[in-house]
From Swiss-Prot:
Segments forming domain Helicase ATP-binding: 31-188
Record-linked Pfam families: Helicase_C, ResIII, UVR, UvrB, UvrB_inter
The name this protein goes by in its record: UvrABC system protein B
Organism this protein belongs to: Streptococcus pneumoniae (strain CGSP14)
Family: Belongs to the UvrB family.
Recorded GO MF terms: ATP binding; ATP hydrolysis activity; DNA binding; excinuclease ABC activity; helicase activity
Assembly information from the UniProt record: Forms a heterotetramer with UvrA during the search for lesions. Interacts with UvrC in an incision complex.
Helicase C-terminal domain sequence ranges: 435-601
Compartments it resides in: Cytoplasm
Length: 662
C-alpha cells in the first residue's frame, strides 16, 4: 500500500517579485486554468522570465505539473531552475536514460541485422524511478521531461500494485520479504550494494531503493515480525533515523505479477504460432526459424527470471492491452487533473508529432523479417492524437508559437517586458559584399569591450571555413557542430561566458535555450535564404540571443529583404517600442543580465587534481581509504547536482575500486 499525500502545497522560494508584465501574465494564466480553459499560449520574448512565470503559475494552481522540453540540455536547465524555486517540493527529471542508444534494426538490402546496443546512465535511471515513485506518493510534483515521456513505460497500476509496503509490527517472514523483493526485480548482492539491490545479514535485510543514490533502509526482524526500519547511509551504514512506513517500488518500470505473467506468456505463444503459420504459408522459412528461436528463448527467460532483454517488445501482452491500443507512458502516472507546460513549444510539438512514424517504419522491418512478433509494433511512442487525449490542461510556452499551437487555442498571453529593462536588440541589414571583413571589424570592437559574438551560418563548410579564417586573423573562435555531445556543449558555452574564446560559430545551435548574457552581437549570414533556419520564427529566435545584453545588436547579411526577414524585423521593432515606453514610464535603465556562471567543470578539476597526485590507493591504510571514499562521494554528489552524470559515473567507479580493497 502506498501512502499518497494529497494536501501538500507548492511553496515558491525566490528573492524576486513578479515585475514588468509578469504579474498580468501570471494572473491571466491562473484565472484561465482555474476557469477550466484547456489550452493557452504564453508568448514570452527571450529573457522575460518565462520560467519564473511558469513557477508562479504552478505554485498558485497547485496541480502536479509535467514540463516538456525538446532536448536533454534544456530539460537540465529547467530542472535546475525549478529545483531552486521549489526546494521543499518534489522536482523530478525524466529523460532518456541512454548515454548511447543503437536501436534494433534490419537492413534488407545488405541482409544486415543490427542488434540493440545501449549504455544506460545509472544516475538518470535513478531520477526516472524517483519521478514515478514521487507521482504515486504525493501531489506536489513537477516532472521536467524530454519527449521521451511519450514512450512506453509499463503499466502504472502494475507498478503501484507491485510495491512492497513495510512497517514496524508487520507480520512477514524474512524469506517472504526476500522473495517479494526478487519478484519486483531487486537483486541480492551481499558485497556490491547499489541501487536496486538488497543484502542480508542474519535477521537484518538492507534494501537500496532504485530511486535513491546514497540512502538505504535497514529492516530488522524479530522472528517473523518487523521490529524496526531505519534509514541509513548506504556507504557508511550510519543511522539517519527511524521510519514508520517504507514503500519499496519495483527496480524496473516493466513489471508484472506471476498470474499476469502466465497469461502474457500464453498470449505470446499463441501469437508466435499465428505468425509462424503466416511465414510458412508465404514460404519464409528462414524468417520463421529466426522468430521461433528468438521468441522461445525470451519466453524461457520470462518464465525463469521474470525478465528478458527487450522485454518492452512484449509490453502489449504484459499490460493486457489490445492490438493498436496506446502504450502506458509517464503521462499515465499523473492523476487526471494535472497541468502540462510545453517549453519552446514551436520545437517540442514537432518532435511529439514525428516520433511515431520513425519508430513504426523501423519496427515493421523487424517484424517482416522475423526478428520480432507483430505485437512489438505496440511498443511505441504515442501518436499526436493519443498525446492530446491525455491533455487535461496545457500551456504552450514560446517566443514564437507554431501553427499547431495557434490552431489549438486563441488565448495568447504576451510577456514582452523584461524585469531587467532590457530591450529587444536593434536589427540592421547589410549587403553580403565584403561581409566577412565587415564582420571581423565588428568582432574586434566587441572583443575590446570584453563582449561576445554569435555567428550563425547555413552550411557546415561555411562555418568551418569562417572559423579557420578568423583563427588566422587572431580571433579566439570556436565552431559548435551537431556532433558535439551535450556535456561538451555545456562546457563550450561556459568557456564562451568566461572569455576563454570570444566568438561562437554555429548552424542550428544558437536559437533557443543558450543563455549567454555576455553576447552583444549576433550575425546572421545568408539571412535572405528562405527555409527552416531563415523563416520568421527562426530569425526571431536567433535575434533573441542578443536580447540579454544592454548593447545587444543584430546584423543580417543579405542582398534582399525577404518577407520572413521583414516580419521578424517588424515584430522585434514592435516589442522594442513597447519595452522602451515601459522603461520611460517607470524610469528604468536597461542593465545586462548578471547571471552566475555555474561551474559545471569544477568537479572535473577537483578529480583531476586528485589524479595529478597519483595516489597509490594500495599504499593507503584503512582510515585513509575511508577518507578518500568520503571525498569521492562528495565530488560525485556535486557532479550529480549539476547533472554531469558522466563524471559522476567515473567517480563512482573510482569509489568502488577503493572500496574493493577493504
Amino acid at each position: 500500500m502506498i501512502n499518497h499525500i494529497t494536501d501538500n502545497q507548492f511553496k515558491l522560494v525566490s528573492k524576486y517579485q513578479p515585475s514588468g508584465d509578469q504579474p498580468q501574465a501570471i494572473e491571466q494564466l491562473v484565472d484561465n486554468i482555474e476557469g477550466g480553459e484547456k489550452a493557452q499560449i504564453l508568448m514570452g520574448a527571450t529573457g522575460t522570465g518565462k520560467t519564473y512565470t511558469m513557477s508562479q503559475v504552478i505554485s498558485k494552481v497547485n496541480k502536479p505539473t509535467l514540463v516538456i522540453a525538446h532536448n536533454k540540455t534544456l530539460a537540465g536547465q529547467l530542472y535546475g531552475e525549478f529545483k531552486e524555486f521549489f526546494p521543499e517540493n518534489a522536482v523530478e527529471y525524466f529523460v532518456s536514460y541512454y548515454d548511447y542508444y543503437q536501436p534494433e534494426a534490419y537492413v534488407p538490402s545488405s541482409d544486415t541485422y543490427i542488434e540493440k546496443d545501449s549504455s544506460v546512465n545509472d544516475e538518470i535511471d535513478k531520477l526516472r524511478h524517483s519521478a514515478t515513485s514521487a507521482l504515486l506518493e504525493r501531489n506536489d510534483v513537477i516532472v521536467v521531461a524530454s519527449v521521451s515521456c511519450i514512450y512506453g513505460l509499463g503499466s502504472p497500476k502494475e507498478y503501484a500494485d507491485s510495491v512492497v509496503s513495510l512497517r514496524p509490527g508487520l507480520e512477514i517472514s524474512r524469506d517472504k520479504l526476500l522473495n517479494d523483493l526478487v519478484d519486483i526485480q531487486f537483486e541480492r548482492n551481499d558485497i556490491d550494494f547499489q541501487r536496486g539491490r538488497f543484502r542480508v545479514r542474519g535477521d537484518v535485510v538492507e534494501i537500496f531503493p532504485a530511486s535513491r543514490d546514497e540512502h538505504a533502509f535497514r529492516v530488522e526482524f524479530f522472528g517473523d515480525e518487523i521490529d524496526r526500519i531505519r534509514e541509513v547511509e548506504a556507504l557508511t551504514g550510519q543511522v539517519l533515523g527511524e521510519v514508520d512506513h517504507l514503500a519499496i517500488f519495483p527496480a524496473t518500470h516493466f513489471v508484472t505479477n506471476d498470474d499476469h505473467m502466465e497469461v502474457a506468456i500464453a498470449k505470446i505463444q499463441a501469437e508466435l504460432e499465428e505468425q509462424l503459420a503466416v511465414f510458412e504459408k508465404e514460404g519464409k522459412l528462414l524468417e520463421a526459424q529466426r522468430l521461433k528461436q528468438r521468441t522461445e528463448y525470451d519466453i524461457e527467460m520470462l518464465r525463469e527470471m521474470g525478465y528478458t532483454n527487450g522485454v518492452e517488445n512484449y509490453s502489449r501482452h504484459m499490460d493486457g492491452r489490445s492490438e493498436g491500443e496506446p502504450p502506458y507512458t509517464l503521462l499515465d502516472f499523473f492523476p487526471d487533473d494535472f497541468l502540462i507546460m510545453i517549453d519552446e513549444s514551436h520545437m517540442t510539438i514537432g518532435q511529439i508529432k514525428g516520433m511515431y512514424n520513425g519508430d513504426r517504419s523501423r519496427k515493421e522491418m523487424l517484424v517482416n523479417y522475423g526478428f520480432r512478433l507483430p505485437s512489438a509494433l505496440d511498443n511505441r511512442p504515442l501518436r499526436r492524437e493519443e498525446f492530446e487525449s491525455h491533455v487535461h490542461q496545457i500551456v504552450y510556452v514560446s517566443a514564437t508559437p507554431g501553427d499547431y499551437e495557434n490552431e489549438q487555442t486563441e488565448t495568447v498571453i504576451e510577456q514582452i517586458i523584461r524585469p531587467t529593462g532590457l530591450l529587444d536588440p536593434e536589427v540592421e541589414v547589410r549587403p553580403t559584399m565584403g561581409q566577412i571583413d565587415d564582420l571581423l571589424g565588428e568582432i574586434n570592437a566587441r572583443v575590446e569591450k570584453n563582449e561576445r559574438t554569435f555567428i550563425t551560418t547555413l552550411t557546415k563548410k561555411m562555418a568551418e571555413d569562417l572559423t579557420d579564417y578568423f583563427k588566422e586573423m587572431g580571433i579566439k573562435v570556436k565552431y559548435m557542430h551537431s556532433d558535439i555531445k551535450t556535456l561538451e556543449r555545456t562546457e563550450i558555452i561556459r568557456d564562451l561566458r568566461l572569455g576563454v574564446f570570444d566568438v561562437l560559430v554555429g548552424i542550428n545551435l544558437l536559437r533557443e535555450g543558450i543563455d549567454v548574457p555576455e553576447v552583444s552581437l549576433v550575425a546572421i549570414l545568408d539571412a535572405d535564404k528562405e527555409g527552416f533556419l531563415r523563416n520568421e520564427r527562426g530569425l526571431i529566435q536567433t535575434i533573441g540571443r542578443a536580447a540579454r545584453n544592454s548593447e545587444g545588436h543584430v546584423i543580417m547579411y543579405a542582398d534582399t529583404v525577404t518577407q520572413s526577414m521583414q516580419r521578424a524585423i517588424d515584430e522585434t521593432a514592435r516589442r522594442r517600442k513597447i519595452q522602451m515606453a515601459y522603461n520611460e514610464e517607470h524610469g528604468i535603465v536597461p542593465q545586462t543580465i548578471k547571471k552566475e556562471i555555474r561551474d559545471l567543470i569544477a568537479v572535473t578539476k577537483a578529480v583531476a587534481k586528485e589524479e595529478d597526485k597519483e595516489v597509490d590507493i594500495n599504499s593507503l591504510n584503512k582510515q585513509e581509504r575511508k577518507e578518500l571514499v568520503k571525498k569521492l562521494e562528495k565530488q560525485m554528489q556535486e557532479a550529480v547536482e549539476v547533472l554531469d552524470f558522466e563524471l559522476a559515473a567515473q567517480i563512482r567507479d573510482m569509489m568502488l575500486e577503493v572500496k574493493a580493497l577493504d
